[in-house]
């Protein structure tokens, strides 16, 4: 049978050669994309398990198909661990992605056409926080709030004033490119003052929240969403949390049958594994090291007058750098660094003047290199290599030196131990 090949790599050589090349790329590249991480072998094993064969529409104890006793155990493990991690009363582990988690949260809290306040994309928000190209901006009347133009920090007085003017039904807090601590209690105060609900998307900082290194939004938000990858170091997927039983029912209905059919139980299993890893004391050490490494890299840029750190520094796993004094734009910087095996992404900065396809900045994250074992010394070295590359973009001899230095670092810290 074609479905029972023992030597599956030989059977589909084109595919497996591509996967092998990606494994080689990840091993030999320094990964600084803030939304990426390195999962454990246990997470990959669960995601590649026989659970992928099972369809299980519904929820534990309330399925539409038979033969779901085992997947009920798996999903319940994931649910209970998520609740324990974040101190939430209810958790839905079925969202296929963070965007779908956000979609379900909106469906549970507001109606199409309602006014919503979300963070401006250039200030650090996410596409699903009201960008016109996103379902969120097309379904709801989003009004964006921005950071202060001088400090590049959230200005809660300005946000309150704006909320009083636009009278939103919902305020969305959370970001994909904001390097400072977010005070969720102040967002809740603003929401209460104008009669709005509060939703928090903590996708980027969930691992730091889980480790107690960033204030948790769960006590303040009516609904909290997150991805399960990024700083949580789990599989790609979504998670929704709430302490409100009625909202939990709405969330469950919004996910299934609202926007999804059967859950991906093999991914739910991988989430369960990663949640167990998060509950291990070693995860707190990992999360603390992520912040240390992020700060170590940022400090190198702060000492160079040719670069500017947005908001003046970082208190989490990422930061933005304005590179326009050194190279034309963020896209040029991203491409140059790709050539020396350092991977990051171009990123808009507050009050951006360039298109999102070029940008003035780059975004640098420490989650993946920390997972590999990089410490503060190696992180500083990485920042120095970035600066060296961008300032010597036409000097092939210097670029080759950078490639060699990158290879030394990646060889010293393998992606996975054999």
Swiss-Prot record:
Subcellular location, record wording: Cytoplasm
Provide the top EC class.
Answer: transferase
Primary site of residence:
cytoplasm
- In this chain, the site described as Plays an important role in substrate specificity is at 229
Recite the UniProt keywords alphabetically.
Amino-acid biosynthesis, Cytoplasm, One-carbon metabolism, Pyridoxal phosphate, Transferase
Q: Does the keyword Secreted apply?
A: no
Pathway assignment reads:
One-carbon metabolism; tetrahydrofolate interconversion; Amino-acid biosynthesis; glycine biosynthesis; glycine from L-serine: step 1/1
> According to its UniProt record, which cofactors does this protein need?
pyridoxal 5'-phosphate
Can you tell me which residues bind (6S)-5,6,7,8-tetrahydrofolate?
121, 125-127, 246, 355-357
According to the UniProt entry, its GO molecular function terms are: glycine hydroxymethyltransferase activity; pyridoxal phosphate binding
Entry EC number(s): 2.1.2.1
Q: For this UniProt entry, what's an example GO CC term?
A: cytosol
The record's Pfam families line, in alphabetical order, gives: SHMT (PF00464)
CDD domains, alphabetized: SHMT
Superkingdom per UniProt: Bacteria
Give the catalytic activity.
(6R)-5,10-methylene-5,6,7,8-tetrahydrofolate + glycine + H2O = (6S)-5,6,7,8-tetrahydrofolate + L-serine
Could you tell me the Gene Ontology terms of the biological process aspect for this record? glycine biosynthetic process from serine; tetrahydrofolate interconversion
N6-(pyridoxal phosphate)lysine: modified positions:
230
HAMAP family, sorted? SHMT (MF_00051)
Quaternary structure note: Homodimer.
**Described function:** Catalyzes the reversible interconversion of serine and glycine with tetrahydrofolate (THF) serving as the one-carbon carrier. This reaction serves as the major source of one-carbon groups required for the biosynthesis of purines, thymidylate, methionine, and other important biomolecules. Also exhibits THF-independent aldolase activity toward beta-hydroxyamino acids, producing glycine and aldehydes, via a retro-aldol mechanism.
**Which family does this protein fall into?**
Belongs to the SHMT family.
Name of protein: Serine hydroxymethyltransferase
Protein's organism: Streptococcus pneumoniae (strain Taiwan19F-14)
